[in-house]
Amino acid sequence: MDKYDKIIDLTKRRGFLWNSFEIYGGIAGFFDYGPLGAILKSSVINTWRKHYIINEGFYEIDSPTVNPYEVLKASGHVENFTDPLVECKSCLESFRADHIIEENIEVDTEGKTLNELQEMIEKNNIKCPKCGGEFKEVNTFNLMFATSIGPGGKRAAFMRPETAQGIFIQFKRISQFFRNKLPYGAVQIGKAYRNEISPRQGVIRLREFTQAEAEFFIDSRKKENFEKFESVKDLILPLLPGKNQENESLSSEEKIVRMSLGDAVKNKIIAHEAIAYYIAVTKKFLMDIGIDETKLRFRQHLPNEMAHYAADCWDAELYTDRYGWIECVGIADRTDYDLRAHMKNSGEDLSVFVEFDESKEIEVYEIELNYKLVGKTFKGDAKILEESLKELSNDKMEELIKTLKNNEKYILKTCKRDFEVLNEYLTVKKVKKNVTGEKIVPHVIEPSYGIDRITYCVIEHAFKEEDDRTLLAFVNTVSPVKVGVFPLVNKEGMDEIAENLKNKFRKNGIIAEYDDSGAIGRRYMRMDEIGTPFCVTVDGETLKDNTVTIRERDSREQFRIPLDGVVDYIKEKL
């Protein structure tokens, strides 16, 4: 067995991870968390909440996992949320084209076009791994699970592919909650769904998974000089910039640069201080949950792999023994893409009024409608046209003026309908106005965390094999069971003292496990395998002097302390 197989074996035996629907043969892309896995995952999430809700001052929302078609049409997911697919001509099995290629030849397929993938398959004579048959042409496959709302399937919908859209949809409410004072942030933690083509990477590639996403709304002019950046500018990180990835003369090691975030921003490797700051927050979080620092790097997306909404994006990648570097966190500058997309498609104003330091005189466009003609032409929709024209930006207004001057029709698209605007419908003039502020559409910095991948990496990075034992060397904050409590033997009242001590731990909010089965060495081994940092043994000495033995997991050091002080001692260590 390789390391991955050993870890999966341990996690199944000890109640961390189980195959879903196992008694029915299981389905690829689904895993259950057992009792200890569920606690571990919750500990990872609670640490994440500490960083974003307590430390950063974000607030959490909770929105539906079913999203109407129009929401994901507006967000771009209907058109863009796809993977390359190949289907076998013989057995009709489907596979991810890029994954099939990477499994057969040493090549990075990230960002390759469908034609390039097709060429690689043909040139290298890649066949179906199941039956050896030839593949059909590479095509695209939308990864969203389709569903419908209500009887009859009349209202099309999808299971959400990300939690972020729920935050963007509620932006007006969130902004009101923060009294419309930028910057501010909202987070959401919950299930997301991706109908993966052929998930063959165990817990790494799931069809149903947990995301923790933070959306930080900021005036785009404040991204370059971000106040909080000063506190992290000297943090040195391993970075894999886009230009280095494309430089074939560099070795894998040479492509990684270790530099401070301050230098990375100064040298235009990272786009700006705001995104660099949240790269630092990500690093701190990953260290807090026990990720091995030597197995962490930050990789910049290449232009041809950038998401449809992103201006810059960095992945926190974690190294795994079987699958190599895997993306676990994406920190993206989503610009104003999402808010503008939902403004356009919903007709709602998702801008924020930003006050100037002092009022100033500016030139603005004013529109006077020919109400008689507009009312006659558009009837009940005339009001929609008027409001939509008033919302036009200066750039759009100049485009309108230029079009009408050429005696052409200007097509104004709104969420309700499209309007053909003619020159005779309106008069546009420039006027000077004294204003105290302006409306802007905020930009969004989004750190998006794949909780399941991160949780697996916490397990793998904690997994250790020594001559006589296997252990999970979790950091104390995420260990599912904090303390094992043992009576050396079940007589002379030792078991009763140990049982009472276990209950005392639990009353103090510490998960403790009582174990009186087998030799004491076997009990230590069981606790080591589930990552319990401390064991407390009640023995003959306890009956004499009211002390107990504490054994530390990593060092295996043993020492005695008074029984009545053991709970406080463990609490302090945790």
Curated annotation (Swiss-Prot):
Signal peptide: none
Classification via PROSITE patterns: AA_TRNA_LIGASE_II (PS50862)
Main location: cytoplasm
Binding site for substrate: R96, E162, F209, T210, Q211, A212, E213, E446, P447, S448, Y449, G450
Pfam families: HGTP_anticodon (PF03129), tRNA-synt_2b (PF00587)
Annotated ATP binding sites: 194-196, 204-209, 327-328, 450-453
EC number, UniProt record: 6.1.1.14
Subcellular location: Cytoplasm
GO cellular component terms, semicolon-separated: cytoplasm
Entry keywords, A to Z: Aminoacyl-tRNA synthetase, ATP-binding, Cytoplasm, Ligase, Nucleotide-binding, Protein biosynthesis
Record family assignment: Belongs to the class-II aminoacyl-tRNA synthetase family.
Protein role: Catalyzes the attachment of glycine to tRNA(Gly).
PANTHER family: GLYCINE--TRNA LIGASE, GLYCYL-TRNA SYNTHETASE/DNA POLYMERASE SUBUNIT GAMMA-2
Protein name: Glycine--tRNA ligase
